[in-house]
Amino acid sequence: TALAGLVEKGAAYVLEEGKVTRYTPVAPEEFCTNKIDRLQEIKQKVLSQLPVLKSDAEGYITIKGELEIINKLKNTVRQAEARIYVSANKRVMELLKSELVDALNRGLKVVIISDKQFTLPQAICYGTEKQNEQIRLIADSQTVVTGDLEDEENSTCLYSCKRNLVDLFKDALKNEIKLIELQKGDNRG
């Protein structure tokens, strides 16, 4: 029966065996925890059987689709070991917020260029007007992710560990910060 199938999948328990079998649902929190635990076990098994990659690809990798781009940004922040520089609008920053907070808690330097309304305690924040969906992220002066999320599922970004591209974007972010600081000075006078 359908209820027996739910028992096999871990979504229900059998209350009594006998002439009449009764079922009770597993609490949603418990069911989800069980499934997540099982996925973690599968993840560890798969990872233990995969060959170890020496480093990220040396070339330029194109990532397509908003969800995949956000996932790459989050994973790049999670894998950073020293510092993160990110330039994006408030909407994108909110999507990265928990990973950035975690990075700060790990002692990483986090520099943010975003809308004036977005702030993150302990991070160095530069407020400006960011109306487009353009994103730029540099991690550990070794990795760059850049592109835009304007076209949602048709959005694309570039991921690379190429030194020349990383240096180019470091200079671009430094210049953006200098421009923000100059504009602040103009607003005061």
Question: Which residues make up each language-model segment?
Answer:
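A short, aliphatic-rich alpha-helical micro-motif
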Residues: 77-78, 138
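Short catalytic-loop micro-motif centered on adjacent basic/acidic residues
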Residues: 84-88, 111-112
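Short, flexible loop segments at the rims of nucleotide/cofactor-binding pockets, characterized by
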Residues: 59-65, 86-90, 123-124
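Amphipathic alpha-helical dimerization/coiled-coil segments
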Residues: 30-76
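Short, cationic-aromatic polyanion-contact patches
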Residues: 11-37
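C-terminal regulatory/effector modules of DNA-binding transcriptional regulators
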Residues: 92-94, 99-189
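Short, surface-exposed connector motifs at secondary-structure boundaries
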Residues: 78-84
